[in-house]
């Protein structure tokens, strides 16, 4: 049985990924602040299994313990492959550094960087000896490579995700049962995060007009299109180990 653990499944890209996997009779471990009832209905429709866990990714001091309880329920005997998709993220604060509050920085770092690091580490510890296909996909962003006015925290944490991914891949080189890991930048996706970006004051985000134009011109990628690309990463034999890739690369 294939297991896929996904964070941030209540809406947007995480929901689209979970939907496509459930249609393939995958067991999805859904982690978000609130349960997505539509995923539960879909699992019943396709005779799949969607197991929801409410987990506060900001609570980094208890995250390993809480995630360990979740992943410990999965036994190697029942697994043909196991994958982790660190999808949950936040772009806030969307304003120049001098305007942002310290608590906003802390929240951004906890959700975007520390949570993926802790979840990946716990995942690797639990599956260390498992002789199955193990993969981690960290959802990154082009902002991890390019600076944006008003996105100091987001750019910084996504750059951290990229480097973390590369470091883990380096550490897995000599392993007998290595974890495959990649950072994936999905492009500009038509989700609630993009709606939030378009509502930002222009003095706080100087690229605002570009993002509004992408929406008006129909150039945003659909969550379903991006989810398909991520699903392909879970299945391909030519896995881009340790790379930071953009969609369609």
From Swiss-Prot:
Keyword list, A-Z: Cytoplasm, NADP, Oxidoreductase
Q: Does the keyword NADP apply?
A: yes
Q: What class of enzyme is it?
A: oxidoreductase
Which reactions does this protein catalyse?
A: (S)-benzoin + NADP(+) = benzil + NADPH + H(+); 2-hydroxy-1-phenyl-1-propanone + NADP(+) = 1-phenyl-1,2-propanedione + NADPH + H(+)
For this UniProt entry, the molecular function terms from Gene Ontology, in alphabetical order, are: benzil reductase [(S)-benzoin-forming] activity; sepiapterin reductase (NADP+) activity
* Major subcellular site: cytoplasm
Q: Which residues bind NADP(+)?
A: 6, 87, 154, 158, 189, 191
Give the matching PANTHER family: SEPIAPTERIN REDUCTASE (PTHR44085:SF2)
Q: What is this protein called?
A: Benzil reductase ((S)-benzoin forming)
- Which species is this record about? Bacillus cereus
């Amino acid at each position: 049985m294939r297991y896929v653990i996904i964070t941030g499944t209540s809406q947007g890209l995480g929901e689209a990924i979970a939907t496509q996997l459930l249609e393939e009779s995958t067991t999805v471990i859904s982690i978000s602040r609130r349960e997505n009832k539509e995923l539960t209905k879909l699992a019943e429709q396709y005779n799949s299994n969607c197991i929801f866990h409410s987990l506060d990714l900001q609570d980094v001091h208890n995250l390993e313990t809480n995630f360990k309880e979740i992943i410990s329920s999965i036994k190697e005997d029942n697994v043909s492959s196991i994958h982790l998709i660190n999808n949950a993220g936040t772009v806030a604060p969307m304003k120049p550094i001098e305007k942002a509050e310290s608590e906003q920085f802390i929240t951004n770092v906890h959700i975007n960087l520390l949570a993926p690091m802790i979840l990946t580490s716990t995942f690797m510890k639990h599956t260390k000896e498992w002789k199955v296909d193990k993969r981690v996909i960290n959802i990154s962003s082009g902002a991890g490579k390019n600076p944006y006015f008003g996105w100091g925290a987001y750019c910084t944490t996504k750059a951290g995700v990229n480097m973390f991914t590369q470091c883990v891949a380096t550490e897995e080189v000599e392993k007998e049962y290595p974890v495959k890991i990649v950072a994936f930048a999905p492009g500009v996706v038509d989700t609630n995060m993009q709606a939030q970006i378009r509502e930002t004051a222009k003095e706080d985000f100087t690229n605002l007009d570009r993002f509004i134009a992408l929406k008006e011109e129909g150039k945003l990628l659909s969550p379903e299109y991006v989810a398909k690309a991520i699903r392909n990463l879970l299945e391909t034999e030519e896995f881009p180990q340790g790379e930071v890739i953009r969609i369609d690369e």
